[in-house]
């Protein structure tokens, strides 16, 4: 009987994890955009999100809710400097991107994450992509240019520039994460803890240096101009709380998602998320979705879905080709140890075309 219930439980677990990621990702974009429309302090907003996530990590650790106890080691911090630096820059650029473009255009502005990631793996890891992978990247790139240059409504080129820069940093970050996991002995939980904590600390001098202090003071003690009965401070606080909590929960759920989801489920959820984000942008913020913008999003999703399918096929082929060496190992004619899928492929399969 337990064996009969196991497949049903597994299906429910997959549905639960995928649904959570879908809802959380959409809520993050909408909440971020709502706050960024009302504030001139995007870096302080990012700091508040990370600070709330850190508090939740500490509370969960105190209540023994995490599988591992949280630690703090200076040598570990030093080893994570490259990743934390890229994380801070990438998240900051993502917020600036969302502040300058419509929510429905955000996915297009950051549409070059996948092509940049493939190029980064070629440059830094010397991993040559297959022809089909190059074709998938070409589709995504074409979708980006359709949205930027062939749409009837011209987007903010400042926002597009931030989006391209953010995509490049995200791509390099996905390469660096492999070495960073080794620093924390392969623990995704510890990596998330250190990343949130150190990123929050690093952001403090940054938002001071870029001149956000006057905006922060105005937000905290200035005159309140109510918008639909809600003040900018209330919007900021609620937005920080919602996105901070969701960011923490997504960090925890990522431990589970790697185990229970497949590239195919990711492909489907990414497509649904892309369409839903556009619809929410139109509904919540009155975004204009032209035929050019819709075509751009569709092409990017098609290229991303094709990439995910190709990576799945290539991993399956690699698994089949390993059967012969494994057989020879059983016969005593040699040894073979099957290698796990590269962390980079897992990260790319999970994120697709990031927006944090």
Q: Can you annotate each of these PLM segments?
A:
Residues 1-356:
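Polytopic endomembrane small-metabolite transporters, centered on the Drug/Metabolite Transporter
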């Amino acid at each position: 009987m337990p064996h009969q219930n196991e497949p049903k439980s597994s299906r429910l677990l997959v549905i639960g994890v995928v649904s959570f990621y879908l809802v959380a990702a959409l809520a993050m974009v909408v909440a971020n955009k709502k706050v960024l429309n009302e504030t001139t302090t995007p870096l302080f907003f990012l700091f508040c999100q990370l600070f709330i996530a850190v508090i939740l990590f500490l509370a969960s650790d105190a209540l023994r809710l995490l599988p591992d106890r949280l630690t703090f080691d200076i040598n570990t911090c030093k080893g994570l400097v490259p990743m934390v630096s890229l994380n801070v820059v990438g998240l900051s650029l993502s917020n600036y991107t969302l502040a300058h473009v419509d929510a429905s255009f955000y996915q297009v502005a950051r549409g070059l994450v996948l092509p940049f990631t493939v190029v980064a793996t070629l440059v830094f890891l010397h991993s040559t992509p297959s022809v089909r992978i190059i074709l998938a990247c070409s589709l995504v790139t074409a979708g980006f240019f359709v949205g930027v240059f062939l749409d009837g409504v011209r987007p903010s080129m400042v926002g597009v520039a931030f989006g391209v820069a953010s995509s490049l940093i995200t791509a390099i970050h996905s390469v660096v994460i492999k070495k960073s996991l080794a620093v924390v002995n392969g623990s995704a939980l510890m990596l998330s803890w250190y990343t949130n904590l150190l990123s929050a600390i690093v952001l403090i001098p940054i938002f001071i240096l870029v001149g956000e202090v006057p905006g922060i003071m105005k937000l905290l003690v200035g005159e309140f101009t109510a918008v639909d009965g809600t003040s900018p401070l209330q919007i900021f606080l609620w937005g920080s709380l919602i996105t901070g909590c969701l960011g923490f929960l997504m960090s925890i759920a990522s431990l589970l998602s790697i185990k229970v989801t497949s590239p195919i489920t990711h492909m489907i959820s990414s497509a649904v998320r892309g369409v839903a984000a556009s619809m929410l942008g139109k509904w919540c913020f009155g975004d204009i979705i032209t035929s050019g913008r819709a075509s751009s999003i569709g092409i990017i999703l098609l290229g991303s879905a094709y990439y995910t399918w190709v990576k799945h096929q290539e991993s399956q082929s690699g698994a089949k080709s390993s059967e012969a060496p494994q057989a020879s190992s059983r016969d005593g004619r040699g040894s073979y140890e099957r290698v796990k899928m590269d962390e980079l492929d897992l990260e790319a399969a999970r994120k697709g075309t990031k927006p944090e």
